Amino acid sequence: MFSHKGKTRTEKHNLGIASLLSFVAGLVNVVGFFSVQKLTTNVTGHFAYFVDEAFKQDFRSAFHVALYIFFFFLGAFISNFIVEIYSRRRENLIYVVPTITEAVILAGIGVTGTYLISKNPDLIAFSLLFAMGMQNSLVTSISNAVVRTTHLTGLFTDMGIEFSQLFFYKDQKHKKKLIKSIKLRLIIIWLFFAGGVSGGIFYTHFGIRTLLFGSLILLLGLLYDFVKIRILLLRRKL
């Protein structure tokens, strides 16, 4: 699911990566909010706060909020920058490096977060926004913009459009394609919710260390992909 791109990518691959990453995003969203009371998987709310602070001419606070937006953007930029570099050198590592980077960030905050909450909570928010920017950019690139996992606004918009199209498109081939797309979006929404609920439950017991669980899920996803590809290559040789 991490290794296929373009014409070799199937709906099954998109479903696999959407399930994995949307669960992690939901978990990060809740853990980030519980720990530092900040939204860490999207920037829509932060932009509203930025405009509000700028309108009140509290430019220091406006700059502070703008940093949240910047770190999400920076994560998206760095993620695709890595993808472009490795696509020209080692294609087999195109998506591995950004995913490992995200896993390391989540693990790092999971380990140091208890200390940072009291000393520098903004560093937690910046790091998680950066990681989620990386994830959203990565999954958008992998799936050719079919899948986005870190926020739900676009998902509900696309799903609303597709539901309305069901009433007008009578062609069975097109209708089948719409239904598959709607199912994919419903799964992403459900697993984002499941990740959030899991994050909330684990947070009551483990606090910000819950992010270690998110990091582990990403690494297990990479391991599964690696083992599956090796098995397929081995079968071809036999």
Predicted regions, residues:
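Alpha-helical transmembrane segments of multi-pass membrane proteins
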Residues: 2-238
